[in-house]
Amino acid sequence: MSKVKIGELINTLVNEVEAIDASDRPQGDKTKRIKAAAARYKNALFNDKRKFRGKGLQKRITANTFNAYMSRARKRFDDKLHHSFDKNINKLSEKYPLYSEELSSWLSMPTANIRQHMSSLQSKLKEIMPLAEELSNVRIGSKGSDAKIARLIKKYPDWSFALSDLNSDDWKERRDYLYKLFQQGSALLEELHQLKVNHEVLYHLQLSPAERTSIQQRWADVLREKKRNVVVIDYPTYMQSIYDILNNPATLFSLNTRSGMAPLAFALAAVSGRRMIEIMFQGEFAVSGKYTVNFSGQAKKRSEDKSVTRTIYTLCEAKLFVELLTELRSCSAASDFDEVVKGYGKDDTRSENGRINAILAKAFNPWVKSFFGDDRRVYKDSRAIYARIAYEMFFRVDPRWKNVDEDVFFMEILGHDDENTQLHYKQFKLANFSRTWRPEVGDENTRLVALQKLDDEMPGFARGDAGVRLHETVKQLVEQDPSAKITNSTLRAFKFSPTMISRYLEFAADALGQFVGENGQWQLKIETPAIVLPDEESVETIDEPDDESQDDELDEDEIELDEGGGDEPTEEEGPEEHQPTALKPVFKPAKNNGDGTYKIEFEYDGKHYAWSGPADSPMAAMRSAWETYYS
């Protein structure tokens, strides 16, 4: 067994194809050699029946991962055109002179722009048949035709240049010209379907029908599981937790580390529904309304112009969203992204987005799991939850959606081109949703209120007024700091009797919201309501492919491949022993008290633990909390 780097495999393929292109062989021979080079790459990863048979199949990557690594290789040829492209475009220009100007302009464009223009032209030509049918019902040149043509112009804006001329005095000539456009355009559409734009190798770096069917079946299984394993989110608790993050001063976040960015980055994704890469690096946002922003820079759009703008909702005030996003992106932990996107060298074949996602997913997802109190949850769940909240909040009341159904709403609000993709974003349901819900500002000091209810019981607590004075001191401390932990050492500083202090802390424990931890020290009892409501039956984690393309999710740049032949199973070799998963503590987000101390809560082995004390950073506080109970 040896490690073969994906980057090396891809670079080998690229070098081989470039050498073939530069050779003086006949084009037919070049095509055969390019096809063979693509086959060698596919065999090294997945298709070699000698390598991947018997027990060797256990070492083979999944079909979905194979497709993702194929996508990486294809992206290396994205800027290269097919060897016959120029010749075929010239032929089409001569054959369809009414479209010659558009077609000829492609010859001077970058490959990405050619794809965009070709896609736009195909969309325009697909409108010919329905437009021609509607136009046949219009008596061009009659008195009532102007209004009908105006409606057609509004419905088919790409054809306005020709439709508007039908209202002129020479409408007969313009009508005949339009029909010629229709005639040539219909034939051109058929030929554009056959036009090869991409480099020849891309037509061989494709999945076989069986492999594609396998992936499609997996997607269907995932969708079926999602629709039968919905996750219920307590709306008020979830949104209150998000607002608590957004309303905290940025100074309380440790924005000098990757993991320290997680709370604010997740909260901004939660209120905008944008992907991690769009929040942290690629997206551009401008306030367009109190709860709307203009968004450009959608990820996973191969042929879309990055300047395309969408109007999306924000679940907090748009101005606050943009301000916090600017603050997050300007922090020290995000200052090296321009270097990160360059990768670690020529063998780093991940996309720029994939390189950033790789470092951020590892830093953010552990915090997300602790935020939800659910190991099944990951950062990108914020996108589906946002879509559900936005639907409940805006779909029925915003006139923008009055003529469309919910599938179109989900598709547009998430920026999808395919209406089927949004089906994967409906796993989450909301409990206790209300459009009139507003976040609590947290002004009420509940601990102080509970202590005040004990006032009448204090005069007889100790001799004289000692009990009353002790009680008043505690109330003052809690009034100054509602989250203060009151301990024996806290009250000894005020010269009260240690015996009376111990009695008082036990007596007022419920009012103070404190308990004695396993270390014998007083700890704050912080009861955070569950965000994910429990299911009646346990729901297993759904191992799913990504919603569109997995390439950006794959941060591994090497896999292990067996250099020799596939191993046949032998009687001596038994199945691998299953290793039990090691228990890991699940921490809730560290709470910075603002005085150099932190509050830490975590779950371990089915038990809840709490700790409070001084620490230099949230991570140090978590380490101290762990070592307090498990040194």
Curated annotation (Swiss-Prot):
Compositionally skewed regions (Acidic residues) per UniProt: 534-575
Known role: Converts the circular intermediates produced by the viral replication and carrying a joined telomere site to a linear DNA molecule with covalently closed hairpin ends. The viral circular DNA is cleaved at a palindromic site called telRL thereby generating a linear prophage plasmid with telomeres. Binds covalently to the 3'-phosphoryl of the cleaved strands.
Gene this protein is translated from: gene 29
Binding site for DNA: 275, 300, 383, 416
Temperature effects on activity: Optimum temperature is 25 degrees Celsius.
GO BP, one annotated term: DNA replication
Superkingdom per UniProt: Viruses
Effect of residue 425 to F: Complete loss of enzymatic activity
Protein name, per record: Protelomerase
EC nos: 3.1.22.-
The entry's keywords: DNA replication, DNA-binding, Endonuclease, Hydrolase, Nuclease, Viral DNA replication
Activity dependence on pH, as recorded: Optimum pH is 7.
Enzyme class: hydrolase
